[in-house]
Curated annotation (Swiss-Prot):
Name of the molecule in the record: Uncharacterized protein YBR071W
Keyword Transferase applies: no
Record flagged with keyword Phosphoprotein: yes
Superkingdom assignment: Eukaryota
C-alpha cells in the first residue's frame, strides 16, 4: 500500500497555492478569476439586502416625507448669522414698502375728485370755479353791470351821459351819446313815447352776458 509522505503533501499544498495566485498569466485563469469575483460580489450584495431593516421598504409617500424631512434638516444647517441678518433686513424692507403702499392707497388721487356735489356748487366756498356768487369773490354783480360803462367813460370816443331803463324791452340799458335828444328826456316821457319813433342812430342797445 502506497503512503504519501509529509513532503509530498507539502508540495501539493504549495502547488495549489501557486495555482490560486494572482500572478496567473493565462487567459482562462483570468476569466475564472473574474467570474469568482462577480460571484463573491453577488453574495455580498445578497447578504446586505438580507440585513436591511424592514423600515427601508416603506411606501413611496413615506419615502418622500422622509426625504423632505432630511432635506429640510440639511438646509437648516446651512443657515448662518449672515443669512439670518439678510432675512431680517428683507423682512423689514417688505414691511416698510407695505406701509408706504397702504398710505398711497388711502391718500386721494390727484385725478380723483373727493368733493361732494354741494362743494361743486358755484356758490360754495370750496368751489374751484370762479363765480360772482362765491363768498370769497370780491367781484360783485354791480361791478359786472357797470364794467362796460366805466371802460367807455375812460375813452374819448363815446361818453355815457345817462342810463335809462326801458319797459317792454330785452335790453337792460340804452346808451345815449352827448348829442342825443334823449339826454334830457325823463323816464315818464320815454315810457309814454313810442319806441319805434326813437332815433336809433343816436342810441344803441346792449345786453348783459353771464359767463
Amino acid at each position: 500500500m502506497l503512503r504519501r509522505s509529509k513532503n509530498s503533501s507539502t508540495n501539493t499544498n504549495a502547488d495549489t497555492k501557486k495555482r490560486q495566485s494572482m500572478h496567473l498569466g493565462s487567459k482562462s485563469s483570468l476569466i475564472s478569476l473574474t467570474s469568482e469575483f462577480g460571484h463573491g460580489h453577488s453574495k455580498t450584495k445578497q447578504k446586505k439586502e438580507e440585513g436591511t431593516a424592514p423600515s427601508q421598504f416603506l411606501s413611496p409617500t413615506n419615502k418622500r416625507s422622509t426625504s423632505s424631512q432630511s432635506k429640510l434638516k440639511r438646509s437648516s444647517l446651512l443657515l448662518d448669522e449672515t443669512l439670518l441678518k439678510d432675512y431680517h433686513s428683507a423682512m423689514r424692507h417688505m414691511q416698510t414698502n407695505a406701509a408706504k403702499e397702504e398710505k398711497l392707497r388711502m391718500a386721494p388721487s390727484p385725478t380723483q375728485s373727493t368733493r361732494s356735489e354741494s362743494d361743486a356748487s358755484l356758490s360754495s366756498t370750496k368751489s374751484s370755479i370762479s363765480s360772482i356768487f362765491s363768498q370769497d369773490n370780491d367781484y360783485s354783480i354791480h361791478d359786472l353791470l357797470y364794467e362796460d360803462i366805466e371802460e367807455m367813460d375812460k375813452t374819448d370816443a363815446f361818453k355815457i351821459n345817462n342810463t335809462i331803463a326801458i319797459d317792454d324791452s330785452k335790453a337792460l340799458f340804452v346808451f345815449c351819446s352827448n348829442d342825443s335828444s334823449s339826454r334830457t328826456a325823463s323816464i315818464e316821457t320815454l315810457h309814454e313815447s313810442n319806441l319805434d319813433n326813437l332815433d336809433m342812430g343816436s342810441s344803441r342797445r346792449t345786453s348783459l352776458d353771464f359767463f
